[in-house]
Amino acid sequence: MKPGIHPNYRTVVFHDTSADTYFTVGSTIATARTIERDGQTYPYVTLDISSASHPYYTGKQKEFSKEGSAARFHQRYGSFLTKKAS
């Protein structure tokens, strides 16, 4: 293989700051920050959102009604459509 063209694959600690959760996974991301975990020093990356805090994965997402967009439109603006011009 050609030297110097491959990314540096290593174990990295990702920190989801909104859920205060740490993930230790393999990655090629470049960072200058480090963290000490389990007696070893790892590269450290902070995240705003991950599967630990995203509403889709946590089940805390807003659920829309089963009616559909046309029914919601008529519910909001139906009174304007049924008014007769005077």
From Swiss-Prot:
Mind listing the UniProt keywords for this protein, alphabetically?
Ribonucleoprotein, Ribosomal protein
Q: Which domain of life is it from?
A: Bacteria
Which Gene3D superfamilies does its entry note?
Ribosomal protein L31
Where does it sit, as one GO cellular component term? ribonucleoprotein complex
Q: Answer whether the UniProt record assigns the keyword Ribosomal protein to this protein.
A: yes
Entries under InterPro entries matching the protein: Ribosomal_bL28/bL31-like_sf, Ribosomal_bL31, Ribosomal_bL31_B, Ribosomal_bL31_sf
Give a GO molecular function annotation for the protein: structural constituent of ribosome
In the record, biological process GO terms are: translation
Task: Name the family.
Answer: Belongs to the bacterial ribosomal protein bL31 family. Type B subfamily.
- What subunit structure does UniProt give? Part of the 50S ribosomal subunit.
**Can you name this protein?**
Large ribosomal subunit protein bL31B
What is the gene called? rpmE2
